[in-house]
């Protein structure tokens, strides 16, 4: 339901599309003549992440899916298919199919990942978690801001109800004398058709009946103002500036996600011996290519 809210859908898709365009690269830090130098390394793991996962998703769709799950549900998961120490493929797993079995102590924490009844160790999965406190669970925007999103969704449904009635005003019928049950039932049917069928927007009242229009509620009168306030609040929770400034958008909405993905890749895709000098990082110069 959250993705039915236009501002939520726009933010999620814009952020996911932006991240999907940025390639990940592998770098190595070397010391030459006493000076530290960073060089780019050609590596098949980058091709798996950027181009072809060797699963059903291409690199772009793979990154989009991860970012959407990360933002909305707080956790994005991908199975790392290895043969010995070589990564052969990456397999996105929908967050709905991931179940965490906890074995936590206050200090020493451990858990397993269950997918379709099969148990996996954490190192077998790429895990990108939002606002995690235990390394196993993340906090998504839907859970973190459920009250705001509920109001936004109800506002959307309220708008739809206004449109479905063709803008017909609410009101009440005043009668100079008592109405028979048959006349009352007929009037109810006609009134129901007036509000349910946009093609039938005319109702004829007898001489003794008079329609009195009800005044607009405060919700109706402040609808546009309320929508603007809600939309701005939704932009805030995604880190999207209300003026849609591109540079600010990259810094506040995109860079934190890139950092989370980089951290996950360095932890889960690098061998222990590689972690001393190798690291994955996004080439953010690609964001402004063509500007």
Predicted regions and their residues:
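A translation/RNA-centric and nucleic-acid-associated enzymatic feature enriched
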Residues: 261-269
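Activation/maturation switch segments at domain boundaries
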Residues: 5, 15, 223-224, 247-259, ...
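C-terminal, well-structured catalytic/ligand-binding subdomain of enzymes
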Residues: 232-255
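Short, surface-exposed acidic
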Residues: 199-200, 239-246, 274-277
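Structured, contiguous alpha/beta core segments that scaffold functional sites
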Residues: 1-223, 228-229, 233-236, 240
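Short, conserved catalytic or adaptor-binding loops enriched in Gly and charged residues
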Residues: 194-196, 270-273
């Amino acid at each position: 339901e959250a993705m039915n809210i236009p501002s939520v859908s726009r933010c999620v898709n814009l952020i996911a599309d932006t991240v999907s365009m940025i390639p990940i690269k592998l770098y190595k830090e070397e010391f030459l003549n006493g000076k530290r130098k960073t060089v780019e390394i050609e590596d098949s793991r980058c091709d798996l992440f950027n181009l072809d996962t060797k699963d059903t998703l291409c690199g772009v769709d793979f990154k989009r899916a991860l970012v959407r799950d990360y933002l909305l549900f707080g956790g994005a998961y991908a199975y790392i298919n290895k043969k010995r120490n070589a990564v052969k493929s990456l397999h996105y797993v929908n967050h709905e199919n991931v179940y965490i079995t906890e074995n936590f102590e206050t200090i020493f924490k451990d858990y397993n990942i269950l997918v379709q009844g099969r148990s996996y160790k954490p190192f077998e999965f790429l895990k990108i978690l939002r606002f995690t406190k235990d390394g196993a669970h993340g906090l998504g925007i839907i859970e973190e801001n459920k009250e705001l999103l509920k109001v936004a969704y109800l506002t959307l449904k309220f708008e739809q109800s206004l449109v479905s009635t063709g803008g017909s005003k609410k009101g009440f019928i005043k009668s100079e004398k008592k109405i028979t049950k048959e006349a009352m039932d007929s009037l109810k049917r006609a009134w129901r058709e007036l509000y349910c069928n946009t093609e039938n927007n005319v109702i004829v009242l007898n001489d003794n009946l008079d329609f009195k229009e009800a005044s607009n509620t405060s919700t109706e009168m402040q609808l546009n103002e309320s929508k603007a306030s809600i939309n701005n609040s939704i932009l805030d929770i995604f880190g999207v500036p209300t003026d849609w400034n591109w540079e600010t958008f990259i810094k506040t909405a995109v860079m934190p996600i890139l950092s989370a993905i980089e951290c996950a890749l360095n932890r889960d895709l690098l061998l222990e011996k590689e972690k001393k000098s190798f690291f994955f990082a996004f080439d953010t110069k690609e964001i402004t290519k063509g500007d």
